[in-house]
Amino acid sequence: MNLTKQPPRRPSNLSIAGIVGLARMTDKARAFNNETLGEYLYGGDSGLDRKILDFLSIPDEQFAEAVEEYDDHTLDTWVIAQSTRTISEIEEFNQRELSIEPQTEEYRQRLKDRLAKYAPDRTDIKTVLQSVELDDWGNFWQLDLTKQPPRSPYNRNIAGVFGIARMAEKAR
């Protein structure tokens, strides 16, 4: 995963263990291991990653090792085995994270700036994770296919399906 060329999966993606942000953190951990993290933060340096790792009681170093060893499907099983969290605790965590609105003036301003820059007519983007998703989209939507090819047709990082990321880039 090279996060200088594409964003990690959306924080709202639940494809690994049904946990908000875990698929995104997986992409960032893989990029961290490959030294292609770009401007993204991983583990203890990232607020959302830190919340997820604390919630699961998994150290960031151990998680980084696991993403090297396991594909997404096997990682899903590994995370569930490592964590003692119940389905209801995971659902509560997800709901809380998906609904958090910016709490400080700095984060409220960051959301306003992103809205002004990328989606001035949108009034439905209100949460921290929606702001992150908007920022990812804004920073990567103008991929110039005359300068580099689209992602590999073997890339499965959108919904776990081969070719969707490539098709989306070509459609732009």
Describe these PLM feature segments.
Residues 1-62, 66-91, 95-96, 108, ...:
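Polar, glycosylation-prone regions of secreted, cell-surface, and some intracellular proteins
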